[in-house]
């Protein structure tokens, strides 16, 4: 992983995001948190990750304000990792990755998961960036500008 002190001066938002959640485990922890996982043991069983690596990634996500530790919701002595508002704001990132994967990484008819709107029971529509007038934007219609 890139040195966080070096990333502090990085002007690219994508590079800073990748520094925080770009490794396999951090992104999958966030995915599992959106799926309702909260306890260390549950993350470990789901991901099959070594305890020391999981501890490190959970700490990094807490230090960044993506997760917070709370007393267990069932009143037991356990503690739970819960997405903060900052963590919840990663939902579109997870959805975009999921949808890209659905479209590009599975053969026709191959079993995979879908994200469903609980209200309608329908698969959520494909996400795409849009211009102020509502037209879908492509990379060729955009440019990066540095701001202070």
Language-model features, listed with the residues they occupy:
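N-terminal helix-turn-helix DNA-binding core of bacterial DNA-binding proteins
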Residues: 12-53
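Short hydrophobic alpha-helical segments that form membrane-spanning helices or hydrophobic packing faces
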Residues: 28-32, 94, 128
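Basic, amphipathic "hinge/linker" alpha-helix immediately C-terminal to the N-terminal HTH DNA-binding motif
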Residues: 22, 73-94
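Alpha-helical linker/hinge and terminal dimerization helices associated
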Residues: 17, 27, 64, 94-104
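Canonical helix-turn-helix DNA-binding module
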Residues: 40, 44-72, 76
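C-terminal regulatory/oligomerization modules of transcriptional regulators
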Residues: 95, 99-148
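A detector for short, charged/polar N-terminal pre-domain segments
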Residues: 1-9
């Amino acid at each position: 992983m890139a040195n966080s002190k070096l990333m502090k001066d990085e002007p690219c938002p994508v590079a800073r995001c990748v520094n925080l959640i770009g490794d396999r485990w951090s992104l999958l922890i966030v995915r599992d948190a959106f799926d309702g996982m909260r306890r260390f043991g549950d993350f470990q069983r789901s991901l099959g990750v070594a305890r020391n690596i999981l501890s490190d990634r959970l700490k990094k996500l807490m230090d960044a304000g993506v997760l917070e530790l709370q007393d267990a919701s069932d009143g037991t002595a356990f503690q739970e990792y819960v997405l903060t508002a900052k963590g919840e704001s990663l939902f579109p990132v997870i959805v975009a990755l999921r949808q890209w994967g659905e479209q590009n990484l599975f053969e026709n008819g191959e079993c995979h998961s879908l994200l469903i709107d609980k209200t309608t029971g329908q698969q959520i529509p494909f996400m795409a960036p849009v211009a102020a007038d509502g037209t879908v934007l492509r990379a060729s219609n955009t440019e990066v500008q540095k701001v202070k």
